[in-house]
Amino acid sequence: MITIKKGLDLPIAGKPAQVIHSGNAVNQVAILGEEYVGMRPSMKVREGDVVKKGQVLFEDKKNPGVIFTAPASGTITAINRGEKRVLQSVVINVEGDEKITFAKYSTEQLNTLSSEQVKQNLIESGLWTALRTRPFSKVPSIESEASSIFVNAMDTNPLAADPSVVLKEYSQDFTNGLTVLSRLFPSKPLHLCKAGDSNIPTADLENLQIHDFTGVHPAGLVGTHIHFIDPVGIQKTVWHINYQDVIAVGKLFTTGELYSERVISLAGPQVKEPRLVRTIIGANLSQLTQNELSAGKNRVISGSVLCGQIAKDSHDYLGRYALQVSVIAEGNEKEFFGWIMPQANKYSVTRTVLGHFSKKLFNFTTSENGGERAMVPIGSYERVMPLDILPTLLLRDLIVGDTDGAQELGCLELDEEDLALCSFVCPGKYEYGSILRQVLDKIEKEG
């Protein structure tokens, strides 16, 4: 058991009831191009084309052989691009139930699959994109290998779904998925990371290693797991995958069909009935949240309130890796003498307002409660950083773009979500996730 003591469980209102319900029906889904770090698409479809579920939409030019497939059947209604023609989203109006089928196997056959059989089915179905590397958080090259594979079966993000509730319903598919992944690199460890008090189904596999984590957020982040179990570096890579994609892998290999259903948390202070809902990867979030939100100007976030993506316009869809939709109020109203008031209804990690001493949950908004200023090293980062790194020094090097110093201090182990708490507690209001990504891109390009 690994116990995480440094960190923060955000006391945010609107926690979801851990019971699965059917979500609003959606008739539009999309693949979000900017979710895939460094991806440059070679389009295989155009607007107006009718596609089947599992059909190839585009291939990554920079990672040949890695294809992205449709999560549902229907008509391509929009291919949205941003500056420099960066692909933002490929939108599908859902129609019919036509699908492409792939190789399938009996449960008994799964434990005898070759690495090539596993790889081929994952690539052809598009499920290869469920895997990501660390460092750099990219979809792995189909010719590459990993030191190990991590399966994350816990989630400590604010307002997250309890994985054990979801896995209770899909236990056989999850164990089948673990079996398949264990065959990808039979001689390499498959690490299953779960909460210490959770009841997660497992499989009797030779290379499966089970690890229990407990404590405050970020105990449930895969970056935390990798740091304590199999740390990475410039010459060492691991892969990781979330538990719902493991379910999809299990279903793919036993049914021959691409499984794109998601059970997500729909929660936050502005959600009328916070709960777990069934939906589909890439679901239109305006449709999914219709009649679900309190009145007022709200911000819908695909993912966690700490590190998710704003869902609007061409990005108004559930992300490929998102397991929650969070909704908070837009906090753009000015407060008279707000900086000097006791503020019993506001939360602070530095004891600057009375709300710090309260045990209640808070209706957080998008307000940063202050303006941008210089980075101030007052110990805030150290309180929320459980990894064996020096956060203040690392963040300073990230800000000034010192790639050599940042590498020495451990930036290659990190992803945007690993620095989300540092951004939250930062007195200078820096967004360290985007700064980290710029540095990682520079390191990958220049070394």
From Swiss-Prot:
Keywords: Ion transport, NAD, Sodium, Sodium transport, Translocase, Transport, Ubiquinone. Its EC number is 7.2.1.1. It comes from the Bacteria. InterPro entries: NqrA, NQRA_2nd, NqrA_C_domain, NQRA_N. It catalyses: a ubiquinone + n Na(+)(in) + NADH + H(+) = a ubiquinol + n Na(+)(out) + NAD(+). One of its GO terms (biological process) is sodium ion transport. Belongs to the NqrA family. This is Na(+)-translocating NADH-quinone reductase subunit A. It comes from Haemophilus influenzae (strain 86-028NP).
